Amino acid sequence: LYTSGSTGVPKGCMLEYGNITAFCHWFKRYYGIDSDSRVAAYASFGFDACMMDIYGAITNGAQLHIIPEEIRLDFIGLQRYFEENGITHSFMTTQVGRQFALEMDCKSLRYLSVGGEKLVPCEPPKDYKFINAYGPTEATIFTTVFEVDKYYPNVPIGKALDNVKLYITDKLGHMLPPGACGELMITGWQVSRGYLNKPEKTAEVYTKNLYDDTPGYEVMYHSGDVARFLPDGNIQIIGRKDSQVKIRG
């Protein structure tokens, strides 16, 4: 799956079956996916979140509903489609999902997740749970999630998924205490193999995990995101090391 990553130049990210499997195990547990669930395939097929829509549903026995192109940005049409088809779970890019959550009630929906860019503070919807998700393609879709249950002046990205560990380090690779800002490092079963035909770039941002040699956690990915741990264990993104701006995920 191709991603611009930290350079702005598209790179082929080599995701493995094990990466997706680890994510789908977490997806089932966190969202309560079962045979009664109906998942909306809303994300673009060029966006890694489409793998969540597709594999998260079909590996757990849920129905998958591909959203018609003509209603993707029609909130009234989308709400009608969700309720007529009993859609229980949906993902949208951050600003689209935020606007939907602010404007639309939806009795069938249980979870609306958003991701791809920083979430502007807002009040959560009353009918369904609103999830702020974070994760680079290199670590398979989501790395953290946070339930927005009230108005937060600066919305955290949450805590690590089941098969992921996170560190925040300084420029020398030393782990930092809560409150201190540094680069967010990601390790675990969701970290991908590296970049297709780019061994030098792979070696630069996929390095040996100096803090944990547990099987599945031997490699850590340098996200390029500056973050800090909050006192409650949630993570807050501060910015980018390279000042990169994300547009439409």
Question: What label would you give each PLM region?
Answer:
Residues 59-63, 85-91, 97-156, 165:
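Gly/Ser/Thr-rich phosphate-binding loop
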Residues 34-36, 41, 51, 83, ...:
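His-Asp-centered acyl/peptidyl-transfer active-site segments
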Residues 18, 95, 117-118, 189-190:
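Alpha-helix/helix-capping structural signal
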Residues 1, 20, 131-132, 147-248:
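AMP-dependent adenylate-forming
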